[in-house]
Amino acid sequence: MKRIFCMMFLFALCLTFNQAHAQRCLPGMKGLQVTGGMADGVHWNSKSNFAYYFGAAMSTYTKNGNRWVIGGEYLEKHYPYKDWQIPVSQFTGEGGYYMNFLSDRKKTFFLSLGLSALAGYETSNWGDKLLPDGSTLTDKDGFVYGGALTLELESYITDRVVFLINARERCLFDSSVGKFHTQFGIGLKIIM
């Protein structure tokens, strides 16, 4: 039994030696990422302006760890009105470029600054303008457009799995409830 355990341990040890390290962020590499987090501050109380977001994107790396990103995002914010919460939802598509400006020698951590163009659709109370008390919402549903500035930290857990932490400021014009939204979130990226 001891011999079998020792052989299995040596076999597992040999599996780790054939991997090339630091083969990260090479031009042409692609990654699929999923992110989510809080928007416009952290509000856990149901009577406050609770807001969250989640999204998915595809990254394609270029030289020096820089990357092109294309994806989609959903943001929902609740506005209190009497005893109700009125949801405002934004569905946006993103296309942008993220520039790596800081990384360690072992290529484990990358800090990037990204600039993206956003376009999408915004709806208030899912299109229902008449509230239960007879009031009418004056916010109009419609298309929104703008941009986002993102600061993102990538931390490689393995050569194919990346943990993400990001902070982002979105500016969307033609929004009926506010142009700016600050987002803080985490995510996971799988390198393909």
Language-model regions, residue ranges each:
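Solvent-exposed loop/turn segments connecting transmembrane beta-strands
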Residues: 39-51, 81-85, 173-181
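Short glycine/proline- and aromatic-enriched beta-strand/turn motifs that initiate or cap beta-hairpins
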Residues: 20-71, 77, 189-191
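Residues that define the transmembrane beta-barrel architecture of outer-membrane proteins
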Residues: 28-32, 48-54, 87-93, 109, ...
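Predominantly the C-terminal beta-signal and adjacent terminal strand-loop region
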Residues: 75-78, 152-192
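Gram-negative (and chloroplast) outer-membrane scaffold detector with strong preference
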Residues: 57-132, 161, 190-192
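Cleavable N-terminal export/targeting peptides
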Residues: 1-29
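Extracytoplasmic loops and strand-loop junctions of Gram-negative outer membrane beta-barrel proteins
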Residues: 37-41, 78-80, 132-137, 168-171
